[in-house]
UniProtKB/Swiss-Prot annotation:
Its cofactor is Zn(2+). The keyword Hydrolase applies. It comes from Mycobacterium avium (strain 104). Its EC number is 3.5.1.103. Binds 1 zinc ion per subunit. The lineage of its organism: Bacteria, Bacillati, Actinomycetota, Actinomycetes, Mycobacteriales. NCBIfam families: mycothiol_MshB. PANTHER family: 1D-MYO-INOSITOL 2-ACETAMIDO-2-DEOXY-ALPHA-D-GLUCOPYRANOSIDE DEACETYLASE, N-ACETYLGLUCOSAMINYL-PHOSPHATIDYLINOSITOL DE-N-ACETYLASE-RELATED. Zn(2+) binds at H13, D16, H147. Belongs to the MshB deacetylase family. This is 1D-myo-inositol 2-acetamido-2-deoxy-alpha-D-glucopyranoside deacetylase. The gene is mshB. Catalyzes the deacetylation of 1D-myo-inositol 2-acetamido-2-deoxy-alpha-D-glucopyranoside (GlcNAc-Ins) in the mycothiol biosynthesis pathway. One of its GO terms (molecular function) is zinc ion binding. SUPFAM superfamilies: LmbE-like. Keywords: Hydrolase, Metal-binding, Zinc.
Length: 300
């Protein structure tokens, strides 16, 4: 019997898994892979959209984190993943917020004891034994402190999982990627948006708002979603209703800033560790499992 491919995605807050890697997750779950998502906080500091859930916000009832467990559960279901997995257990570390956010009662993720956080992720890696781990780049994508710390913790955990420290049998992760945004495809997708894709109160993103993209020659892999995975990504984004609004055509979404973001059907990656598999004419892998030997993955 062919071995089932296993992939692990590490994210900072509920909704990050859908925004940056939703199509990839749905693509591999549909192919029968064992896909798991680790979320490092409950996203308590998120900016709530609209009045319906406004009282959940941190400066009111401070109940947003618990509510977002339900949103993440629903989003993962749309992507074909099981129950949420929170690093250290649900609520162990609090969303740190953006720079300048005051400390709260519970320990923020950026203040976590690094050995404890790394050890918690090592335990997940050694239990699942993933062939691929996906995290963030050193800037954490757009620079959120929790995203930066996810990079630190994930990088250390991938290295430690294959060594002798921490309990459990070591597992050397074959391939480790960063999830990144590719500048050219993003800009092309923005240019392709039409007024019909947007809500009346949305604006188009400016070049100054998108400074963290990667040039084509710095990209190592792309996962091009089919119609099923793209639809699953849109449904997962809609499940995060306190944080994301999906536009009328399903081709764009917006966060609380009302800046339109194209819902990409391609997601891009940088290979950090491990050997690349076959590449296309752009020099990109088109499968995160490329170069790893599997028989036909079971379908479901």
């Amino acid at each position: 019997m062919a071995e089932t491919p296993r992939l692990l995605f590490v994210h900072a807050h509920p909704d990050d898994e859908s925004l940056g890697t939703g199509a990839t997750i749905a693509h591999y779950t549909a192919a029968g892979a064992d896909v798991r998502v680790v979320t490092c906080t409950l996203g308590e500091e998120g900016e709530v959209i609209g009045e319906r859930w406004a009282e959940l916000a941190v400066d009111r009832a401070d109940q947003l984190g618990g509510y977002r467990i339900g949103e993440l559960t629903a989003a993962l279901r749309e992507l074909g993943v099981g129950e949420p997995c929170y690093l250290g257990g649900a609520g162990r570390w609090r969303d740190s917020g953006m720079p300048g956010t005051p400390k709260r009662r519970r320990q923020r993720f950026i203040d976590a004891d690094e050995r404890e956080a790394v050890g918690a992720l090592v335990a997940v890696i050694r239990e699942q034994r993933p062939h691929v781990v996906v995290g963030y780049d050193p800037a954490g994508g757009y620079g959120h402190p929790d995203h930066v710390h996810v990079h630190t913790v994930t990088t250390a955990a991938v290295a430690a999982a294959g060594a002798g420290d921490f309990p459990g049998e070591p597992w050397a992760v074959p391939k480790f990627y960063w999830s990144v945004f590719a500048t050219r495809p993003f800009e092309a997708a923005v240019q392709a948006l039409t007024p019909e894709d947007l809500r009346p109160d949305w604006s188009m993103p400016s070049a100054e708002q998108f400074t963290f993209g990667y040039a084509d020659d710095h990209i190592d892999a792309v996962v091009a979603a089919g119609p099923h995975a793209w639809a699953a990504k849109r449904a997962a984004l809609a499940a995060h209703a306190t944080q994301v609004v999906v536009g009328p055509t399903g081709r764009a979404c917006a966060l609380s800033n009302n800046v339109a973001l194209p819902i990409l059907d391609e997601e891009h990656y940088v290979l950090v560790a491990g050997a690349a598999g076959a590449r296309d004419e752009r020099g990109w892998e088109t499968d995160l499992l490329a170069g790893l030997e599997f028989g036909a993955a079971p379908r479901r």
